[in-house]
Every structure is written in structure tokens, then in C-alpha cells.
């Protein structure tokens, strides 16, 4: 083990020597750059661009380009990057992660690689975790880029597609991780190229990279549409039922946070819902509601997993940052179950139209880099998943913070008493204190205890995150006491007020260990920035969540031996301290394994998504006739239909092929069994294909010109692809839930998911081609002289696709072109148009 550790340390030292050598070369240009006038320094940007066009690589330009940015930052911002910041910038340019401590100037470090990579003209995305940081960094650092002649854009959720397109066309674009992901998904749902906003993904530099690529790796970005549902009463009934249960009626598995009914609970459910067998196949939907109601009531905790806003909305709390996750909902009906539990309005369920995880989103960039102060503990995952190395960068000044040994107490009560006493003592001498908590519930509890002790303080958690910047700004002032969840102002420095250094600097107090050592290190890193004095102290108890869920029998035995009199005594035990770290490592390992498994499943979706999106993009950007592609689909559809009946009785086969041809290819009266008898399969295929080509040409002749034809072809393909892809995503989700049980049959669930997912994808492609064929052959196309051909083509395709989706039992001569939403549908169904063939449009 010591040999491995020694090798790792030597590798890090060797890497730092290489970086220092390049950094010195950058520094060698300092005097020359300082001697240049503003105009001459600004002229370096077009010079570099020209040199790049002439064949010089970005690596060859690096020393000069970095030196230009250093000098520009000095003139514009009054800041001059240190050598360690240059080294960090080189690591970023190489597509790796420099681990730089809090307060070491990561934002300024990023300016050098961002400028260098922007010279290529393909766009650089600077990714932050929230819009406040995006706006702040784009405003401050944007001054340097603009001064050097580069354009800077900010991509915010509230911007219109036109404004977003403008932001993405800039040399440098600041955005949040979620907005970049959603823009990518939305771009792959549009019908016209001019509605797309992003360029091809080139270089992303991710701030707080561990938060985005590790903590949120499993978080899927989902674009979904509402599904009409009358199931709200079922959510309420299921909720009313589970609230009648006693603790013996359900079983909770604490480590996995899963729950199920016990035998007595099943008996109660059958009695409550008047059923003979709860788990009969016809009750599958009901058991889904009951399972979600159980989770909502006995697993999901108010103020820990979610909060209720003043507007009565359920907001998810991010377990890593403590922030509420606006716009996000628990999936699979759990969110609706929580809404029923809390008695707020139940919102409709939704159907996923497109989704992607951050893991696969950011792996699509040509080059990916990131910055953080805490990543070394996740080095293996960065390397395995993202092919990124973690390079620890030395601090500019030695760290003066004192990290005290953890103080361990027997109970939560004794721990909190000690925390309050410590805070009070420091407050009375004027030393600022930041108290870090894992949950909103804990921050509220400590706040209440501090009020009782007469200590004025500020609370920063998911309930008042809008005051974050102001609270963090004052957290380093004399006598300030701040309670914060893990959000603790990542990306915002806590600057010490006058006279605070002499008092020992900011003291960070952790009230329990997080599941991840990295999050603990982030909390510690709030103190002792840039060589400032500071302290950190963690208070733990044997009743903490981490110890309760992952502690060993030895800890439980230790607890049993404790007397009530011993409650307030600090426990000094190396064994228990090791158990804490061991529990954290175990959780980190479990989380990594889970993320790896998620990636294995998501890679199936990724491969399929890339095929669909690439073909979709090809259709959208096409300036050519798409006839050859559509004809190929028609040919394959006919071949599949004929081949499907080749092994059946010949008479039955001919009858089935005739039925297919009549419903999907030709007018009914124009083909019969007599015409196909005596022909071989290949001859039947050729005959049907020739008839289809005649109808295809006849259909397109109804459109005015080539532009209208191309628009019709595009919308025809895109609407059907989108419809089928949405259904396929839903089917893959269901498959994923189903294959999990196959592990009990000694089958590998991932392998099963891969093989069945591939077969489902092939089936979906066949279904797309069948619908394109049927719609192309059977659509009622009318020329609209007074309307733009493109608008007409879009409407016609949408209506005909919806017609095919609803069924074939309608009046095929009906004209839908001038029907208002509340008119009777021309298909004579008796329904209003908006509820029949106009349903897709409205």
C-alpha cells in the first residue's frame, strides 16, 4: 500500500514539474507584454487567430496567449494571475481537473484556457452551478475577454430562443449545466433548423466540476409533456389508506430506503380496497399508488428530502447542496404521492419526450475540463468515466487553518449542547462562526437553540437561498454567526472583516459528517482562504444518520454500554473515529457503483439517442430532396410485410398481404388476392413497390413547388420519429424496471437490458418506417394557394400523423385545413375537432 501511495505522490510531483516549466515560459513574456500599448496588446487576438488558421496549434500559442490574458487582467481588473494559477490554467487546457483550494482564484485561472480555446472560433462554454454565478463571472471576467476582442454571451433559462442563439454564437458562453442540457434536448425536438440554438459542442469548462459530474451524475434532464389523467383520487385514496397503518404493517429497509407492506398491511389493504388479492394482476396499477404513498409518508421526509413552498408547491431539496431544485419533480408518480400526503394541489403526471444524464451530456464535448477544490477522493471515477486526471495545485500561500480532531458524543442532544456552547464562547470573543448542517431540519433545530441561548445569527438553507450572496458576504465579519446547509455559498468567498484575523479567523463547525468526505472538505474549505487564519471542528454523535445507517455492530454495542450519566462526555476512541471514515468510504463506494450501473444502462439509451438525433439533424438541415430516404423506408416496409407472411399458408399469406396493401399502400378497390396469386414473394414486393412509387409521385404533385415538397417531407419524418421516440423512451423505462428482477434468476440485468433494448430499438425503426409509408400513401394533400407552403406542409403532416395515430376508421376524404378547434370534426366521429383529429394541434 505504501508503495502505491509513494508512486501516486511521485506522479503528482512529476506532473507539477512539467506544469512549472510551461508556467515559467509564460512568465518569460511578462515584461514584453507589459511594454505593449493597449492597442498592440489587443491586436494580439486577431494575430493569434490568423496563426491558428495558418496551422499553429493551440499548444504552440499557449505561452504567449496566457501571457496576453495575464497582462489584460492586470490592466482591466487589477488582478495578475500567480504562477500556481497559470499551472491550473494549463491543466484545464489539457482537459483535466486542477484541484485548487478555496480562495485560490479559480475564476481568474479559467480566463487563460478559455481565451486560448476561444481563438479556434468553435465556441467555449463556461459552466456554473447556478445563474447567479454565471451572471457574476460573465460580467466580471467578460470585461477581460471583451477588451481583448472576444464576444461573451450569457445563456439564462428566461431567454428567448433568439437570445439563446445569439449567446451560443459568441466566442465564450456562460451557462448553467442544466440549461446547456435542456437546450441540447430542445434542439433535438425542433422541426426547423432556424429554431435550433446550439452550435456543435466544442469545449466545456465546468466550475465546481465534482458537483456537476459526480454529485448530479445520476440526475436525468427530462423534457416532458403532461398526460391527461384522472388518477388524482387514487393518489388521495392510497394516501388515506397508508395513514391508517401502524408500524407493524410495513417494513422499511433503512440502508436502501425501500419500503413494503407486511402481511398485516396486505390484509388491511385488501379490506380497505375491498379486494380478494392485492397482488392480483388486475390490481397492478393500485399497488403502484400504494407503494408510492408508502414511500411518500414513511421514507420521504419534510424539510430533508423536500420542502413545501409558500405557494403550496412541493420542491425537491438537493441532498448535496441543500438548495431546492426548481422545476424538478420526483418521477414515477412519487411527486404526486407527496402532494397528496401534504394536502396540496396534485399536478398531472407527465410523459418523457427526451432525456439525458449529465454524464452523457458532457461526454459529448470534444474537450472537457473542470475546476474544484475537492476532487481527489473521486479520482478513479473522473478517470474511468470522463478520462480526466485530477492534478492537485499547490496553494499560493501556506494553509494557516487549524483542522481540529473530531469531537464524538453519545447522543444527538449532547452533541448539540456542545455545539451551542462552542458557538457561544466564540461569539462572545467576536470570532465569526459558520455552522454547517446536512439538512434543513438540523439548521432549524440549531437556530432554535441559538435563539434560546440569546445568540443573534443568520440561517442559510433551501427556504431562503435567495439571500445567499448577502448572508455569505457578511459571514466573515466580527461576531457573525451563520448557519448553513451544504450549499454554504460554493463559488462565493467568505472574506474576513477588520480585526478578525487576530481572533483566529473564521471558525467552521460541522454538526455531522456527510456521506461523502468531499462534502466535508468543502465545508472546511470555507475557512482559511489564501493563507488566512481559520479553524474547523466537526461534532459527531453515535446517533447521526451516517452512523445509524452504516455503523457496525461494534458501535451499536458501544452505545448500549453507555450510561445516561456519560451522555455529555466526549468519547475518545480511535476505533470509533476509524468507523466514521470507514462508513463514509463505504457510502462513497456504494454511490460510485450505483453511478457506474446508471451509466451502463444509460449508455444503451445514449447509443440509440445519438442515432435518432443524428438522423433527425440530417433531416432538419437537408437542402436536398428527401425522396430517396422515404422511398427506401417504403421499400423496407413492404419487404418486412411480405417476409412476415412467407412461412404461413399461401392463401392466408396472400390475404394478409392484400389487407396490408389496402390499409397502408394503395386504395382498397385497386388490389385483390387474384392479382397476387401465382407470384413469388420477390415479384409481389416489386409489384407493390412500383404501385407505391406511382402513388408517391401523385401525392407530391399536389404540392406547389420543391420548397413545399421538402418541408412536407421533413415534417412527415420528424413528427413520426418524435412520436415513436417518446413512446420508446417510456418503454425503455419500463424495461429497466422489469429487468431488475431478473437478477434473482441469475441473469445479468444490464445484459438483458442491452439485448432487449436493442430489439425494441429495431422494432421502433420498423414502426417509424411503417408510419411514414402509411401516412405518405394515405394522406389527403391539398394545395393551399393563399398560405405559405411551409406552414401548410407542417399542418398537413401533423394532422395526418394524428389521423393515423387515432385509427383508420374515419372519412378519408375529410378536409381538416380550415377547421376551428371547437367545430365538429369533419371525420363524422361526433366529437369536437380539438378532441378528435385536432387533438395533436391543441
From Swiss-Prot:
Reactions this protein catalyses: ATP + H2O + cellular proteinSide 1 = ADP + phosphate + cellular proteinSide 2
Cofactor(s), by name: Zn(2+)
Keyword set, alphabetical order: ATP-binding, Cell membrane, Cytoplasm, Membrane, Metal-binding, Nucleotide-binding, Protein transport, Translocase, Translocation, Transport, Zinc
GO molecular-function term, one example from the UniProt record: ATP binding
EC number of this enzyme: 7.4.2.8
Residues holding Zn(2+): 825, 827, 836-837
Gene3D superfamilies (alphabetical): Helical scaffold and wing domains of SecA, P-loop containing nucleotide triphosphate hydrolases, SecA, preprotein cross-linking domain
Family: Belongs to the SecA family.
Protein name: Protein translocase subunit SecA
Organism: Streptococcus equi subsp. zooepidemicus (strain H70)
Gene: secA
